[in-house]
């Protein structure tokens, strides 16, 4: 399994949310709303003979300008446990990530924050922790 395939699978699942642009790599100029996948940690040798590896990702969802009421409402929709705009539901919609994983789980939403994209604007976003089980 390649890390690129897993990241691409996460991007594809995220793009099942209407209007959300997924990025499997950090973009130079993301189109907002965006969901950016970054690799945090890899835990090797989780079972015998290298049969399981845990890949831990962050998915940063950026929705709009920091002071926008609609951006804050969008965050609520993305943070929901279920629904058509739920990040958790979208990521877990194909648990094999197109055949590159055994399973994927969204384990937490870790916070809402101000995000600076170096374009003169402050954006609001949140981070999700995602664990992928593969070999």
Predicted regions and their residues:
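Charged, amphipathic alpha-helical segments and their flanking helix caps
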Residues: 1-31, 41-135
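Two-metal-ion RNase H-like nuclease active-site motif
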Residues: 37
């Amino acid at each position: 399994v390649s890390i690129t395939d897993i990241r691409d699978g996460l991007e594809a699942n995220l793009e099942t949310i209407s209007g959300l642009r997924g990025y499997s790599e950090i973009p130079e100029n993301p189109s907002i709303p965006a969901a950016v996948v970054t690799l945090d940690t890899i835990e090797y040798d989780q079972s015998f003979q290298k049969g399981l590896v845990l890949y831990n990702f962050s998915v940063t969802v950026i929705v709009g300008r920091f002071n926008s009421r609609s951006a804050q409402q969008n965050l609520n929709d993305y943070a929901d446990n279920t629904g058509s705009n739920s990040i958790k539901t979208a990521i877990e919609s194909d648990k094999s990530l197109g055949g590159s994983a055994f399973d994927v789980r969204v384990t937490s939403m870790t916070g809402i924050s101000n995000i600076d994209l170096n374009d003169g604007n402050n954006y609001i976003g949140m981070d999700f922790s995602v664990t992928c089980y593969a070999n």
